[in-house]
Amino acid sequence: MFDISKRLEVTPLTWGSLGQGILTGKYDKNVTFEANDRRSRDIYVNFHGEKLIKNLKIVEELKKISNEIDKSVSAVAIRWILDYLSDSVVIAGVKNINQLNGNREALGWNLSEEHIKILEMISKE
């Protein structure tokens, strides 16, 4: 995506940057949703089967990094996008002030090269 956006001279705009909440660290392998929640449908693969397991591995790395640098998991996820896709715009929804504050922690700093490499590697597995 980075190469394409650079070649076309467009700014990447990431919608659903926290994966409908999966990258906030609040869900585990036993997650279930009400029938009226769109994430309960199989079309939302991030919350089902092998894709869920893969995403939870990414979340575990996000949690390790967030503990190491004293930032929220969502802040690390957002910062990863901003650092990996330079000049990108992140859209992340919130339901309450705590989520907003957690997301705001992504501002004013950068992930280390080591953290970016770890997250890039695990996301490509």
Q: Model features per residue range: what roles?
A:
Residues S17-L18, H48-G108:
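Conserved short secondary-structure transition element at the edge of the structured enzyme core
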Residues N110-E125:
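Extended hydrophobic/aromatic segments used for targeting, binding, or gating
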Residues F2-K63:
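Glycine-rich, positively charged active-site loop/lid region within alpha/beta enzyme cores that binds
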Residues K26-D28, E34-A35, Y44-V45, S88, ...:
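Charge-rich, low-complexity amphipathic helices
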